[in-house]
UniProtKB/Swiss-Prot annotation:
The keyword Transmembrane helix applies. Belongs to the RAB6IP1 family. Residues 289-452 form the cDENN domain. Residues 154-201, 854-874 are annotated as: Disordered. PANTHER family: DENN DOMAIN-CONTAINING PROTEIN 5B (PTHR46070:SF3), PINSTRIPE, ISOFORM A (PTHR46070). It is a single-pass membrane protein. GO terms for cellular component: membrane. One of its GO terms (molecular function) is small GTPase binding. The chain crosses the membrane at residues 962-982. Guanine nucleotide exchange factor (GEF) which may activate the small GTPases Rab. May promote the exchange of GDP to GTP, converting inactive GDP-bound Rab proteins into their active GTP-bound form. This is DENN domain-containing protein 5B. It comes from Danio rerio. PROSITE patterns: DENN (PS50211), PLAT (PS50095), RUN (PS50826).
Length: 1311
């Protein structure tokens, strides 16, 4: 109890919370690892056996020296601390992730260091630092047990060798294996004799001949990651145990000192405390500096190289699944901690396990973003490592210095300049940016040098013991090595050094009466190295931080803060938009967009914005406070000289300043902790045998001092600040609401669970998986809702109900995110891993079964899974709707090389066809296949959640996507075209030779000749994108050349998208306007749902688009008496011009077809045609139809006639130029070889006039010409000067925009 109480008060401000010893418990003896048994239980469950009946039996195939045995926490001090309860299972598992390791004198017995962290459920972290060494086994029972196990292994080995020949033929029958089996076997392959080239076969264990050693670990648990300080303290502790003579004080004194008398350094301060032999320094950054990060980034850059590390950094920012792979636990930790500290001001929000214990391999099955580290074994081949899911995985092979990236990976902005700046920082510290080299280990000393070192150490210790110095050492000046000065053995040691040719700088310096181990400013070489690492660390981090400060310099302007108080914000958190993403993206340089559009969708960015909003009512989150301070400082000093929209790279300006702050702290130590001293121990206590870590005196280590002025003062201050902050929080919100919403708001996304290491029962694992299932369903709901809102928002914009935004980029990001989610769902609980894409693998299994069934049936009738789109009334044959048919389309695309790419293409195609939910429902309807492929806990085997998931996907049928057509722009696509004549009024067929040319946003098909008397044709051509126009014509040959066409229908045979091109006009000489060729403007036919709700399987009736009326001659229009009013005509022109202006205000990739806005229904040509027709005189003169084009021709004839008689020369100069251009354009159109008819010619003139900015110049010529009086009534709009003047102003607004015309409109015109 006293331990708990003593720990609770001062623990938050203590340097270390616990000292722990883990290893072999002699009393319980050798125990198989319980977690390995749990793993067997899980595998038995997966294979459908009774897990309870599975014997835990011994694995005699494996050498006992290589088996996993249970380690135990042998001692930990203090017993418990209230603010950081001791988690025995987690600590034991992470101190010895593989359990106990046994070795003999033939093996390497070198100690090694690693660190770990434990993430608690609230997201807070505790750090552990472990020094593992080997201790001789003295227990006869343990040695005897190991001998017995070895003999059983030998017997098993001999038996299996005899049976090897007979079993080899049958062993190949089973081809499929569990992905987790493969993973564990690939990790264990190296334990087999062959993996080591037979190293172990003849080197067993003989208790008489061999000395047996077992691993033991010393561990410090600390609240902050002071890695270097803890590493040095533990190394000195081990030296004290392994070397002779013992240190001047009992080990308990040093442990007590570090646990209870060494405080945490305050912010912006440095601390010095004493280990067994040398002082240890550490320092903590100030409030305005980057937070503490003591893991050496230099090592991470050295291992991976700058380029790979930047790619890994980008993957982490985009919250992909990251798996680090290395033999060395510390390397895993260094890379994981290094990469997460570089995220400032953002924080990783998902599963974070830098060291994944072997018993937790099933956690790689998690269908969520994660950052995990997996230990490899020497000689393991990466190709054997089969992971449950790889579609969105970034695999980092640290030891081989390489990285495997996911597909569709956007690059970090200004990547090459960024890499260059980082390389310059590394080179300034003498480190190569290339990487690919291991951490530089200290050079191995020769035998003579180590002898000298030992003599040196023993001499210094003897002097220290003789000095009878207990309690605090005699001040700062008392350095252990100084005691050697004037020592009689010094000359002997120097003479020995000279004879052996070994140069020891320290001895020479001591002989000269100096401190030989001190470098610049009185620091030892170790301290110099630590200072260098700290300066390099902070400079590299500053470069990363500066990139974010530049990219998000104005982020605050786009934060949406519309809640009056914290309570209402928390209550409505999920329904609110907190950040104006579209406006933010539109403000960014174009090259940044692919990365930023993905990044602002991540959980870490959402949490960052949440923290910003909550800072209105609460104390600012520390990282946010530092980042905002940086931005404010940059504004104050006007560092950001280039504009925000510029993509000019700006280098970091804080490098020297940040390095100086660290150097100053280490040059002038702010606080020196109390020195280790004798404790209240009896005489004889504290003695121990050399080479063996002793059983410590628990009573003296159980609790700290009752009065420690420094810690009490500091802690009372900290407690007061903490209490004040909590009171403020409680004033804002009552406890109940806070409990309900606060965790959710602050930890959105964090609820996708850290693995809890302390409880790994099957029930807990099942519960964790169930939470994953719930998380996936919630994510699906949020993603589909977001896609619908974005898409509907865009359609509202197109209807004039909003503002144009960057939507296509966002849409593509959201679809890519949906593809990633589906891959994660299909990877969850996977039984058999085949290929990198779990979804595509499932589809291939389904395809194989269905095709086999089809062959067995041998029937041409399509089965229930395949249906045709219902035959439409206009002659388009039904389109086959089938999962397998769409798969075949993807399989025929040579451009896609990988399974992940094929799966994504299939998802995009199904989404575009509005069949995604239906297809996946069909795929999962084969329950036998699903059971074969997936474990019981898999998402796809949870019936209720699966149904909800499919329902959410079904909601996407409410909107139109072109996500397949717009992405795969180079593929060949089959199209089907049908010409539909008006049979009642003309011949269904024509004797002439018809042709058509289909054009789209990406190109055109070229002229396609249609077989006579055939109204339907299919053709293949490169993806045309969304279709815009069809040119339809014939050569006017034969007796029945006149042809009245209602419309042309064109369908993309892969996506099923159908376009209708209304005509309603004659093609033929001497009828209508005499056109032999018409340019038809297309409209997308929205598919109708059938009885299953949004299936989209039949072509709709033609009246689906009522706005498109048939284009008819002016004469028939006037005869019907449906003349538009003058106001309607003026409004239609204004609206047509406004739509064109809106078109150009959209981002270039989002603009769509300008041809529709010019020539389509309600377009500029249509509106001007209404204008020119208003007040047109009697329709029939000499029984001939009169068209607007006739008016233009007469104007031109009149001008040319006046020019010939000389009258035109008296006109003003500008009028002469305008007249000349009008004549030139009209004559060019009349002289072209195409027979496009008079209405077609008028359309072309308007388009050319708009393109070349000539319409406002021509309009006054038409209005002032004498010809107008003969062809227009007095009340005609064209004769109203005010109307003409206002129309000029409207048309002139188009001069600011570069109008380009499709070749289908301008073909053959020579100007």
């Amino acid at each position: 109890m006293s331990a708990t109480m003593s720990g609770s008060g001062s623990a938050p401000c203590r340097f270390a919370h616990y000292f722990i010893v883990c290893g072999l418990d002699d009393e319980t003896g050798l125990e198989p690892d319980a977690l390995a048994a749990l793993y067997q239980w899980l595998e038995a469950d997966r294979q459908g056996k009774d897990p309870e009946a599975t014997a835990a039996g011994e694995n005699f195939d494996q050498s006992p020296l290589k088996r996993t045995f249970k380690s135990k926490v042998l001692a930990h001090y203090p017993e418990n601390i209230e603010c950081n309860p001791f988690d025995q299972d987690a600590v034991n598992m992470l101190c010895m992730p593989k359990g106990l390791s046994f070795r003999t004198q033939r093996d390497s017995l070198a100690p090694h260091f690693h660190s770990f962290l434990i993430t608690r459920e609230d997201g807070s972290r505790t750090y552990g630092f472990v020094h593992t060494f080997y201790e001789e086994v003295t227990s006869p029972q343990i040695c005897s047990a190991m001998q017995t196990l070895h003999q059983m292994h030998q017997a098993e080995h001999n038996t299996s060798a005899q049976n090897c020949t007979s079993s080899s033929s049958s062993s190949s029958s089973s081809s499929s294996s569990s992905s987790m089996d493969s993973l564990s076997s690939s990790l264990d392959d190296v334990d087999s004799p062959s993996a080591h080239g037979g190293r172990r076969t003849c080197e067993g264990y003989d208790s008489i001949r061999d000395t047996l050693y077992v691993s033991k670990a010393m561990c410090l648990i600390a609240p902050m990651p002071f890695m270097h300080a803890c590493k040095r303290f533990l190394a000195q502790m081990h030296r004290a145990v392994s070397c002779s003579p013992p240190p001047p004080l009992p080990l308990e004194s040093y442990i007590y000192n570090v646990l209870y008398e060494v405080p945490l350094p305050a912010s912006g301060r440095s601390l010095k405390f004493h280990g067994v032999y040398e002082p240890i320094l550490c320092q903590r950054p100030g409030v305005g500096e980057l937070p503490l990060a003591d893991f050496p980034l230099a090592d991470a850059f050295r291992l991976l190289g700058v380029e790979n590390l930047v790619q890994l950094f980008t993957c982490v920012l985009l919250e992909m699944q990251i798996l680090l792979y290395s033999q060395d636990y510390q390397r895993l930790m260094v890379v994981a901690e290094g990469i997460t500290t570089l995220l400032f001001p953002f924080q990783w929000q998902h599963v974070y396990v830098p060291i994944l214990p072997a018993s937790l391999l099933h956690f790689l099955d998690a269908p969520v973003p994660y950052l995990m580290g997996l230990q490899s074994k020497e000689g393991t081949d990466r190709s054997k490592l089969e992971l449950p899911q790889e579609a969105n995985l970034c695999f980092v092979d640290i030891d081989n210095h390489c990285i495997e990236l996911p597909e569709d990976f956007p690059q970090f902005p200004n990547r090459s300049e960024f890499i260059q700046e980082l390389s310059e920082v590394l080179l300034s510290f003498g480190q190569s940016p290339e990487g690919g080299s291991s951490s530089p280990e200290p050079a191995v000393m020769s035998l003579q040098t180590s002898v000298l070192e030992k003599e040196l150490k023993s001499t210094s210790l003897r002097e220290l013991v003789d000095d009878k110095t207990n309690g605090n050492l005699g001040g700062e000046a008392l350095d252990v090595l100084e005691l050697l000065q004037g020592n009689p053995t010094l000359e002997r040691l120097q003479a020995l050094a000279k004879r052996t040719g070994v140069k020891v700088a320290r001895l020479e310096a001591l002989a000269a009466g100096q401190k030989g181990d001190e470098g610049v400013g009185g620091r030892s070489p170790v301290e110099e190295e630590e200072l260098r690492n700290a300066k390099l660390n902070v400079q590299l981090r500053e470069v990363f931080a500066a990139r974010f400060a530049t990219m998000f310099a104005d982020y605050e302007s786009f934060v949406i803060q519309n809640s009056p108080d914290l309570e209402s914000w928390l209550t409505n958190r999920e329904q609110m938009h907190n950040f104006d993403k579209a406006s933010f993206l539109s403000d960014q340089p174009e090259p940044y967009l692919p990365f930023l559009s993905h990044f602002i969708e991540t959980q870490m960015f959402a949490t960052f914005i949440d923290n910003k909003i909550m800072s209105q009512w609460e104390e600012k989150e520390p990282l946010l406070r530092v980042f905002d301070g940086r931005i404010e400082k940059a504004r104050l000093y006007n560092v950001r000289a280039p504009s925000l929209r510029s993509s000019v790279y700006q280098k970091c300006t804080f490098l020297k300043e940040s390095a100086q702050a660290i150097e100053q702290r280490l040059r002038k130590i702010d606080h020196t902790a109390i020195h280790p001293h004798l404790l209240d121990m009896k005489i004889g206590q504290g003695k121990y045998q050399q080479g063996f870590f002793p059983k410590l005196q628990a009573d003296v280590l159980a609790s700290g001092p009752t009065s420690n002025k420094w810690s009490n003062r500091t802690c009372s201050t900290q407690r007061r600040v903490e209490r004040h902050r909590q009171q403020n929080e409680h004033l804002v919100l009552d406890n109940e609401l806070k409990e309900k919403y606060m965790q959710e708001a602050r930890n959105l996304g964090k609820n996708l669970r850290q693995p809890k290491l302390s409880d790994l029962s099957p029930a807990v694992i099942a519960q964790t998986n169930w939470k994953f299932v719930e998380g996936l369903l919630k994510e699906c709901k949020m993603k589909t809702k977001r896609m619908l809102v974005e898409k509907m928002g865009r359609e509202a914009v197109e209807l004039g109900h909003g503002e144009a935004n960057i939507t296509g980029l966002e849409e593509n990001t959201l679809i890519a995110s949906l593809c990633d989610l589906l891959e994660r769902i299909w990877s969850h609980g996977l039984q058999v891993k085949q290929g990198k894409s779990a979804l595509w693998s499932h589809l291939l299994h389904y395809q194989a079964r269905e095709e086999k069934n089809e062959q067995q049936l041998e029937s041409p009738v399509s089965n229930g899974q395949e249906r045709r789109k219902t035959e439409s009334s206009v002659g388009l044959p039904g389109l086959r709707v089938s999962v397998i048919q769409d798969m075949r389309h993807i399989q025929n695309m040579a451009e896609i090389k990988t399974d992940v790419g094929r799966a994504r293409a299939w998802i995009r195609l199904s989404l575009e066809k509005k069949l995604l939910s239906q297809h996946l429902k069909q795929l999962l309807s084969n329950q036998a296949l699903t059971k074969k492929l997936y474990k019981r806990y898999a998402f796809l085997r949870c019936e209720e959640e699966k149904e909800q998931f499919l329902f959410h996907l079904l909601s996407l049928n409410a909107v139109d996507y072109f996500c397949f057509t717009s992405v795969f722009t180079t593929i060949m696509i089959p199209y089907r075209a049908v010409i539909i004549p008006i049979k009642k009024l003309s011949n269904a067929m024509t004797t002439s030779n018809p042709w058509l040319c289909v054009s789209g946003e990406l190109g055109d098909s070229g002229i396609l000749q249609i077989t006579k008397n055939i109204l339907e044709m299919t053709f293949d051509c490169q993806n045309l994108g969304k279709l815009t126009t069809v040119q339809l014509g014939h050569d006017n040959s034969g007796l029945l050349a006149k042809w009245l066409v209602d419309c042309v229908m064109v369908r993309n045979e892969i996506t099923g998208h159908t376009y209708k091109f209304p005509c309603g006009r004659w093609l033929g000489k001497g009828v209508d306007d005499g056109s032999l060729e018409r340019v038809l403007i297309g409209e997308f036919v929205v598919p109708c749902g059938d009885d299953e709700g949004g299936r989209g399987s039949k072509t709709p009736p033609l009246q689906r688009s009522p706005s498109q009326i048939r284009r008819i001659s002016i004469t028939s229009l006037t005869g019907k008496g449906n003349k538009p009013t003058t106001v309607q005509i003026q409004e239609s022109i204004g609206e047509a011009v406004n739509n064109i202006i809106k078109h150009f205000h959209k981002p270039e990739k989002e603009r769509g077809s300008l041809t529709v806005l010019l020539c389509g229904e309600g377009g500029l040509v249509w509106a001007l045609e209404q204008f020119f027709h208003h007040g047109f005189r009697s329709a029939r003169i000499f029984q001939k139809n009169v068209f607007v084009w006739d008016f233009f021709e007469r104007i031109v004839a009149f001008m040319e006639n006046r020019d010939q008689t000389g009258d035109l020369q008296e006109s003003p100069e500008p009028l002469s130029l305008n007249s000349e251009s009008l004549c030139r354009y009209v004559n060019a159109i009349n002289n072209m070889p195409r027979n496009i008819g008079k209405d077609g010619k008028f359309q072309l003139l308007v388009c050319l006039g708009a393109r070349d900015r000539l319409l406002p110049q021509w309009l006054p010529l038409l209005a002032e010409s004498p010809v107008i009086t003969r062809m227009y009534e007095e009340n005609a709009l064209l004769r109203d000067k005010l109307t003409v003047s206002s129309l000029l102003g409207v048309l002139e607004t188009l001069h600011d925009f570069p109008i380009t015309l499709e070749t289908s409109l301008t073909k053959s015109v020579e100007l």
